[in-house]
A protein has these predicted regions:
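Short helix/loop capping segments that flank catalytic or ligand/cofactor-binding pockets
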Residues: 28, 64-65, 121-123, 170, ...
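Residue-level detector of flexible, active-site-proximal loop/helix-junction positions
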Residues: 24, 79, 145-147, 180, ...
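Flexible, acidic/His-enriched mid-domain "rim/lid" segments that flank
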Residues: 92-215
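Aromatic-residue-lined binding/catalytic grooves and analogous aromatic/hydrophobic interfacial grooves
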Residues: 224
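Acidic/histidine-enriched ion/cofactor-binding microenvironments in catalytic or ligand-binding pockets
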Residues: 37-50, 106-110, 132, 153-156, ...
Length: 244
């Protein structure tokens, strides 16, 4: 639970945690989503030990940012264009921007970094930042990191969300069962009322419609396979194959 974060940080001697939320990686960024409660926005969450978490966000995402309940800090507090003009180099400008952010917010000491990122550019950014801030010690956790440990236990609000998603998922599964049961057997093939074969593709079309109707996401597709494919891990199924 989030209330465990300060204890976990103290146990590991972590002064602050930084959770990156870059553009385009929202659905694959559980650490960032954990703090922003699934809000559709980009930014950076920073939490100092013993203090509330802060969200650095773009000013045009103010409404989404407000829904997170975090302490809000718009990024236009720092003038990136001015920094660009001073450094004359895009990479150095972003390093300097992050240095100013950390300095102004009092971020230093042992700092852990989390979130789904573009590995190469983020490694370059952290390397440059460490050179600019001698008092910064970058802490990397390989296994059982602070956030994953905090997420092992759930707040009542999280459990309620999980139940709602479970109920919606069951409704989608029931719609698929009803659709398949509406067909009839023609030999070893399942056909619809007109006698046309019902295919895996038809089932997946229904799945996508029902998921959308329930407000659920399907970013990587749903596995629905039969026969040999069903025995192969992560085989998604041949959409043209009729149901047997």
């Amino acid at each position: 639970m989030k209330r465990d974060l300060d204890r976990l940080m103290a146990e590991r001697n972590i002064d602050a945690i930084v959770v990156e939320g870059p553009d385009g990686l929202g659905s694959a960024n559980p650490d960032f989503n954990y703090f922003v409660q699934g809000a559709d926005l980009t930014g950076t969450v920073i939490k100092k030990r013993g203090e509330p978490a802060m969200l650095l966000h773009s000013p045009w995402e103010q409404i989404q940012a407000e829904s997170t309940g975090l302490v809000l800090i718009p990024t236009n507090r720092w003038n990136l264009r001015e920094i660009m003009n001073e450094t004359g180099d895009r990479f150095q400008a972003y390093v300097e921007l992050r240095r100013r952010i950390f300095t102004d917010l009092g971020i230093g000491g042992r700092v852990g970094f989390y979130g789904t990122v573009h590995a190469s550019e983020h490694f370059a950014l952290l390397t440059g930042l460490a050179q600019k801030l001698p008092g910064l010690e970058i802490v990397a956790e390989f296994d059982k990191d602070i956030i994953s440990q905090a997420r092992l236990t759930k707040e009542p609000e999280e459990i309620a969300i999980m139940r709602r998603v479970g109920q919606k998922t069951c409704a989608v599964v029931q719609a698929v069962v009803d659709f398949i049961q509406s067909g009839r057997a023609d030999g070893d093939t399942l056909v619809d009322a007109s006698g046309a074969p019902i295919t895996i593709g038809h089932v997946k079309q229904l799945l996508r419609r029902e998921l959308a109707a329930q407000g659920l996401e399907d970013p990587q597709g749903t596995i629905f396979a039969q026969g040999r494919d069903a025995g192969l891990p992560h085989a998604t199924g041949d959409e043209g194959a009729p149901l047997k």
